[in-house]
Amino acid sequence: MFNRFRLVHKQLRLYKNFGLLGQKASVGLTLPIISLSRPYMAYMGTERSVVMITAPATKEFAESSERSNSSKKTTNKEQSDKSAESRMATSGIVESFPTGALVPKAETGVLNFLQKYPEYDGRDVTIAIFDSGVDPRATGLETLCDGKTVKVIERYDCSGCGDVDMKKKVTPDENGNIKGLSGNSLKLSPELMALNTDPEKAVRVGLKSFSDLLPSKVRNNIVAQAKLKHWDKPHKTATANASRKIVEFESQNPGEASKLPWDKKILKENLDFELEMLNSYEKVYGDIKTSYDCILFPTADGWLTIVDTTEQGDLDQALRIGEYSRTHETRNVDDFLSISVNVHDEGNVLEVVGMSSPHGTHVSSIASGNHSSRDVDGVAPNAKIVSMTIGDGRLGSMETGTALVRAMTKVMELCRDGRRIDVINMSYGEHANWSNSGRIGELMNEVVNKYGVVWVASAGNHGPALCTVGTPPDISQPSLIGVGAYVSPQMMEAEYAMREKLPGNVYTWTSRDPCIDGGQGVTVCAPGGAIASVPQFTMSKSQLMNGTSMAAPHVAGAVALLISGLKQQNIEYSPYSIKRAISVTATKLGYVDPFAQGHGLLNVEKAFEHLTEHRQSKDNMLRFSVRVGNNADKGIHLRQGVQRNSIDYNVYIEPIFYNDKEADPKDKFNFNVRLNLIASQPWVQCGAFLDLSYGTRSIAVRVDPTGLQPGVHSAVIRAYDTDCVQKGSLFEIPVTVVQPHVLESDQNTPVFEPASSKGDNSVEFQPNTIQRDFILVPERATWAELRMRITDPNRGEDIGKFFVHTNQLLPKQSCRKLETMKIVSVGSENESIMAFKVKSGRILELCIAKYWSNYGQSHLKYSLRFRGVEAHNPNAYVMHAGRGIHKLEIEALVAEDVQPQLQLKNAEVVLKPTEAKISPLSATRDVIPDGRQVYQNLLAFNLNVAKAADVSIYAPIFNDLLYEAEFESQMWMLFDANKALVATGDAHSHTSFTKLDKGEYTIRLQVRHEKRDLLEKISEANLVASFKLTSPLTLDFYENYNQCIVGGRKYVSSPLRLSTRVLYIAPITQERLTKANLPAQCAWLSGNLVFPQDEVGRRVAQHPFTYILNPAEKKSHTNGSSNGSSAAGSTATAAAVTTANGAKPKAPATPQAATSVTNPAAGDGISVQNDPPVDSSGSPASPKKGKANADDYAESFRDFQCSQIVKCELEMAEKIYNDVVAAHPKHLQANLLLIQNIESNQLKSQLPLTFVNAQKTSPPEAGESADKQKEDQKKVRSALERIVKLADKVIQETDSEALLSYYGLKNDTRADAAKIKTNMDKQKNTLIEALSKKGIAVAKLAVLDDCIKDSLAEINELYTEIIKFVDANDSKAIQFALWHAYAHGHYGRMYKYVVKLIEEKRTRDHFVELAAINGALGHEHIRTVINRMMITAFPSSFRLF
């Protein structure tokens, strides 16, 4: 059947799952229209990396594939053949669907195994799923095969994302009423109170937003549904009404708005702002998060959790749920999200378990799904599941060190307590920079080596280039089973709707061996796609997913079958015997890329036979540690230039028993094995025999690559027990050698073209053909251009899709550091060009693959051209401003047109910790058995943002490290001034920017380890905040040093031949730094430098550039925000004596500052701690020279007295005020300072509707409380009247007409103009504040007297007087403008002013006022939303890690 065949033209769309930071995403691939009429081609690892598989070979493969499944009954086989023929027919309806291939099992012998051993179906086996969470209500995951026993026996969120702080205890009153952390009143019914077994009947309260407990897509669906149900109708009605009012006003007042009278103008403004308010809430609705009150108390059946999903406080109608480990309860929060709970630390922490993606449920379904139809069962349908969520929802489902360690700790605990975890499946991973060390890897080894858990991990979806295996399985020891992804013909038909079945193969994107240190990361391959169950929140029963994430659970399920059988036969096993069995019995696929399949395709039947046949083998309970050289590499890997000499290696081999520390000493003493060592290739040599007892032996291995042709070459040294050769090798030493092509040095343009037997120099590609070329990148090359074209005749506009993957390995860097992955469309009419960055002197792998499902044969002609321009002088890409002019010596690989450009795009601020505190973590889930307490070092940092900016935050010493890190966690959380969580980051946060509003922020960084002394060493670790500049800073180049000094003729472009050109860069001027508005304390600027004029080269050949600024200058500051002067080192200080809400300020640092009268909103933005306030009254900033005279003394004493007016109690303040006024009757500042004192002591509510609502509270009929309320109102009235009198004094003593005349001047030519301006500004600010204070007091008095309309004339007069000097939005006037809008009933204007105040400083009072505004307008749906926003925006404490 495979001899010759032809595929019909058709288009097909497939989906491939890629892993990005632990989160799976689907990428659609549209495949071309191509015909196939040639035999199949496959990779074989020769120089050209491609060979033809002959027709007999393909026939042999087909026959072997059929033989592997021939244990079924003949009748079944005939029926299957007939079904296959009918499916391939051009007409007719097929009544049977190939359901068995939806969750494939036949390929690996699982079906035959279960048919032979139906009782070995995974019973008595538990699989831990380290993933994004498992839905126990998904189809097939509810129960075991008996239909009764729960399948998902435990659910844990190990990430901390679902943690709720429940430390606060409250006791209900006699009616069961308590106050939740949301501020809502909650009522416990007598039934609930009776369940409470707490001795004091106390309950614990907490607050939780569930927004990060489910994927963003599902969160959007929830928001969309809620919006449709509760928002759209009232909001659309309100919007229409607001629009209608505007139309009516315009029809009644025709003409230009600017020509309207003043009262009509503000009315029009109000209507416009009402509509603007409605539109703004419509835009932000999707970002609003809902937080729920959580109540927790003990009962006779364990802890009971109540979540007030009603938001009304009626706990009888709220969600009730018990601990999952006791009750296995899962409850729906809404139509999408279901949760379970666990309780830790005696009730102090409530763990709410959700799911950060559907991935974990899909994985579990493959491993252990149990369905009514056995065709779609998982591999081990009767195995139990323990769900361990390691994907943190705060990080978009990426795994964290904290989650991994907690998950491993829980596995250890369960094994220790007799609830054994037999298998771990981990379809997660990243790429580590090195694998021979790291705390996470060490603990993984401990789980396997000490607790005997078989750990299965996905190899990764990062192929087809070599050295792309992820971590895990690439850790310090090869203790894990790594799995590659395979696709069978049956899967192609059933899962992908392909019109023809191609021969089985690995997926193009599955990661490839070797590990960077030479080890083997891929143990076996298995089916890597399935249409399996997904969580209910997807609103789908099943979905197609593919990737090594799907291959790993297939193997994990298969291991569960093996262990189930071994347990029932009472055969002792270990993770080592399991791994060796599946390795030596795997079906080697000779036509498949050997670097992708490991030992071959998993064969469950043969693996079980091997385990039972060799049950008495003395090596079943031990592993063989293989370490190469001093770095303890797992294998030998030569990829460092051209190999011209043989190399000798010392390889250390050590047998280690399972749980070595507790192993029987007699077993160690008696152990001896005599080994025969066999190298698979003649260019690898070693001794033939090794006698090995329980201890370390070393052998010498010589690798002689001198005779190897360019390409990749692999070999392996296998060690066989001479007493039992048939059980296969006990261990292997993998060897990989890469010999690169070296381009001729005399070439004008270095170009690589592959050798080809075709006349047109093309290479033939079939589906999944992989062509690898290894080229030594020439010196001075910085980028390469790949040119491709199809040479097949008569192709017309037909195109081919090629997966191009280039990779260069750099020391102590992951494979992702310098690589390019791209799917390129290639046609026959025009060349397709792909450019990418390269590193000179390093071997480049150019890997071109035809996608696995891409029908048709193509002949591809391609070439690789190297180009480059770079600076070669030391520290060329780092410039220090303090060193002046920076020099660049640039050279080109070939003749290039040079047009350098240097753009600095980010400003980097170093943040030093303000606090570092080491403390023990949870005593229940952060203690590694036995008794190894994990500690945290919690570092706190302050970040001030002067204006809204995009900011990235990272910890340099922990950045880009996870599995290889010495510490197990480096998570940080960014909080605003109200302790609301704004952003979260971890190992890879340096590339993620967050939009931050103006304000002050706190960053908390948690670093974890079990050794306190190590944590102490990082107490001074700093963070870096990277601010995106609003516009990049571009630096100029000069060809002449002197021209650079004077800023003369600039260098633009010129041709660069085979010579060196010197260019100079001048430091950035202070003026430009000031205009750039850099953040305070900026340490350096970062950006990119490009040299080539060629546009393609400019996109890819970018050199990271760092510009180090001069140290910050310390000097006096003025009110306002930092403008980035002094190399962005200077900052502004907030010098306000008053605050926006009238709170009593701190004492000023100097007497002179006491007379400062500033705007109510001052003090927001960037500030420097410990800087003294600045006197805005015009008093000198420093003492006068010489001895002080009597006038100086009097003035200083006056200023000191004024400073005490603000600080003292009101009675004392009045006395000091009287003294100041008596001595200095014209000193108007004293009046305003006394007003501030009165406001801070007696007037708490400053915003209009808040104040009004406080006065509307109905007084009691009689009694002591009524008298007290009347007395309080009397005090308020007295205070307001006093404010009016004090303000009147200032207003009467200030000549407003003179001020207006002065500010009407265009130019003041008087000699003392500056002094006059200072004095006039002082008078203006004093007058504005007095007018504002009086206006607010008058409005409040009118509210108390319920005669606001009678006071409108006076309020309007004060308002019009203020706006003669400043705009109503000005911070000096906005508080009174808010009251003026209230007096007129202009709620739209009120909204606008409150939003302006929020931009300056976000407080709960502002949100309360917004809610009241919408309540007054009748917008109850908006009021409800604002109340929700307040709960989330103003938490009582920082969120838990």
From Swiss-Prot:
<dbReference type="GO" id="GO:0032991">
    <property type="term" value="C:protein-containing complex"/>
</dbReference>
<dbReference type="GO" id="GO:0005829">
    <property type="term" value="C:cytosol"/>
</dbReference>
<dbReference type="InterPro" id="IPR036852">
    <property type="entry name" value="Peptidase_S8/S53_dom_sf"/>
</dbReference>
<comment type="subunit">
    <text>Homooligomer; forms a complex of 6 MDa probably composed of 40 subunits. Forms a structure consisting of 2 segmented and twisted strands that form a spindle-shaped structure. Each strand is composed of 10 segments (a segment being a homodimer oriented head to head), stacking of these segments leads to the formation of a twisted single strand. 2 strands compose the fully assembled spindle.</text>
</comment>
<feature type="compositionally biased region" description="Basic and acidic residues">
    <location>
        <begin position="75"/>
        <end position="85"/>
    </location>
</feature>
<feature type="compositionally biased region" description="Low complexity">
    <location>
        <begin position="1139"/>
        <end position="1155"/>
    </location>
</feature>
<dbReference type="GO" id="GO:0042802">
    <property type="term" value="F:identical protein binding"/>
</dbReference>
<dbReference type="GO" id="GO:0008240">
    <property type="term" value="F:tripeptidyl-peptidase activity"/>
</dbReference>
<dbReference type="InterPro" id="IPR050131">
    <property type="entry name" value="Peptidase_S8_subtilisin-like"/>
</dbReference>
<dbReference type="GO" id="GO:0004177">
    <property type="term" value="F:aminopeptidase activity"/>
</dbReference>
<dbReference type="InterPro" id="IPR046940">
    <property type="entry name" value="TPPII_Ig-like_sf"/>
</dbReference>
<feature type="region of interest" description="Disordered">
    <location>
        <begin position="62"/>
        <end position="89"/>
    </location>
</feature>
<feature type="active site" description="Charge relay system">
    <location>
        <position position="131"/>
    </location>
</feature>
<dbReference type="InterPro" id="IPR048384">
    <property type="entry name" value="TPPII_GBD"/>
</dbReference>
<feature type="domain" description="Peptidase S8">
    <location>
        <begin position="107"/>
        <end position="608"/>
    </location>
</feature>
<dbReference type="Pfam" id="PF21223">
    <property type="entry name" value="TPPII_Ig-like-1"/>
</dbReference>
<keyword id="KW-0720">Serine protease</keyword>
<comment type="similarity">
    <text>Belongs to the peptidase S8 family.</text>
</comment>
<dbReference type="InterPro" id="IPR015500">
    <property type="entry name" value="Peptidase_S8_subtilisin-rel"/>
</dbReference>
<dbReference type="InterPro" id="IPR034051">
    <property type="entry name" value="TPP_II_domain"/>
</dbReference>
<feature type="region of interest" description="Disordered">
    <location>
        <begin position="1255"/>
        <end position="1274"/>
    </location>
</feature>
<dbReference type="GO" id="GO:0004252">
    <property type="term" value="F:serine-type endopeptidase activity"/>
</dbReference>
<dbReference type="InterPro" id="IPR023828">
    <property type="entry name" value="Peptidase_S8_Ser-AS"/>
</dbReference>
<dbReference type="Pfam" id="PF12580">
    <property type="entry name" value="TPPII"/>
</dbReference>
<keyword id="KW-0378">Hydrolase</keyword>
<feature type="region of interest" description="Disordered">
    <location>
        <begin position="1139"/>
        <end position="1190"/>
    </location>
</feature>
<feature type="modified residue" description="Phosphoserine">
    <location>
        <position position="1182"/>
    </location>
</feature>
<dbReference type="Pfam" id="PF00082">
    <property type="entry name" value="Peptidase_S8"/>
</dbReference>
<dbReference type="InterPro" id="IPR022232">
    <property type="entry name" value="TPPII_C_art"/>
</dbReference>
<dbReference type="InterPro" id="IPR022398">
    <property type="entry name" value="Peptidase_S8_His-AS"/>
</dbReference>
<dbReference type="InterPro" id="IPR000209">
    <property type="entry name" value="Peptidase_S8/S53_dom"/>
</dbReference>
<keyword id="KW-0597">Phosphoprotein</keyword>
<dbReference type="Pfam" id="PF12583">
    <property type="entry name" value="TPPII_C"/>
</dbReference>
<dbReference type="InterPro" id="IPR046939">
    <property type="entry name" value="TPPII_C_sf"/>
</dbReference>
<dbReference type="GO" id="GO:0017171">
    <property type="term" value="F:serine hydrolase activity"/>
</dbReference>
<dbReference type="InterPro" id="IPR022229">
    <property type="entry name" value="TPPII_Ig-like-2"/>
</dbReference>
<protein>
    <recommendedName>
        <fullName>Tripeptidyl-peptidase 2</fullName>
        <ecNumber>3.4.14.10</ecNumber>
    </recommendedName>
</protein>
<comment type="function">
    <text>Component of the proteolytic cascade acting downstream of the 26S proteasome in the ubiquitin-proteasome pathway. Efficiently cleaves Ala-Ala-Ala-polypeptide and Pro-Pro-Ala-polypeptide, Val-Leu-Lys-polypeptide only at high concentration. Does not cleave Ala-Phe-Pro-polypeptide nor Pro-Leu-Gly-polypeptide.</text>
</comment>
<dbReference type="Pfam" id="PF21316">
    <property type="entry name" value="TPPII_GBD"/>
</dbReference>
<feature type="active site" description="Charge relay system">
    <location>
        <position position="549"/>
    </location>
</feature>
<feature type="active site" description="Charge relay system">
    <location>
        <position position="359"/>
    </location>
</feature>
<dbReference type="InterPro" id="IPR048383">
    <property type="entry name" value="TPPII_Ig-like-1"/>
</dbReference>
